[in-house]
Amino acid sequence: MSNEIELLQKQVSELQDLVKKQSLIISKTGERVLELQLDKQKHDVTDFDSKFSKSISKKSGSATQFDATDFATNEDLVELVKELQGELNFIEERSIRRLVNSLKKDDDDVIAPLPNADGDIPAISDGVFPKSLKEFKDIPDLKLVRLAKFYERLPPTLKEQEDFENFLEGKVEAFHINETTDEEISKELEKFSKDELDDAFNDVARYLGLSLRRGTEIW
């Protein structure tokens, strides 16, 4: 028992170190993006000063026309920082929850739901996200596909692509992949082989940080 506890403590320590390294890399990436944005801002200002000086030296009586929208405003930079911070928060939240899920071993252990790419967290109350390790292990195919779609572990169908394009073109006000009906998923399930469903199960398990796998010799 003591050896198992020591092993778990070692795994927790290694995972914590990994999360710290990932957070540092993400933070450095965000700083670099801001540096590039500021460098561009400085370059644009210098370029404008040069054009303005040439215009004055020619004594043309009017300054060269320029488009003020080419320059990033303080509001743009603030918004960029907010977006980057939001992404960092989601990534950190996913890392923490994956760390928690990686330690789940017993059937009754509760699974922590992770945010998807849009930052949405599935509600356990709606019955789609499994409450425990056993529920995930025995998840029905329909719920598995719905969960895989939520986490973008499956490619979109033609209809989903069309719906998303309509959303981008402003033809519909909102687009949510989880609005696919059970009937639509049931029809889609007919095209899946057992191996494809096993792959979907394993992909979702990896995303959630769970050690469960279907099949043999699967990492």
Curated annotation (Swiss-Prot):
Additional note from the record: Present with 1550 molecules/cell in log phase SD medium.
Protein source organism: Saccharomyces cerevisiae (strain ATCC 204508 / S288c) (Baker's yeast)
InterPro entries associated with the record: DUF3294
Taxonomic classification: Eukaryota, Fungi, Dikarya, Ascomycota, Saccharomycotina
Cellular component per GO, a single term: cytoplasm
Primary location group: cytoplasm
UniProt gene name: MRP8
Numbered residues of crosslink Glycyl lysine isopeptide (Lys-Gly) (interchain with G-Cter in SUMO): 137
Superkingdom as given in the UniProt entry: Eukaryota
Keyword Ribonucleoprotein in record: no
Positions of modified residues (Phosphoserine): 23
Keywords: Cytoplasm, Isopeptide bond, Phosphoprotein, Ubl conjugation
Statement: the UniProt record of this protein carries the keyword Cytoplasm: yes
Protein's recorded name: Uncharacterized protein MRP8
Compartment list: Cytoplasm
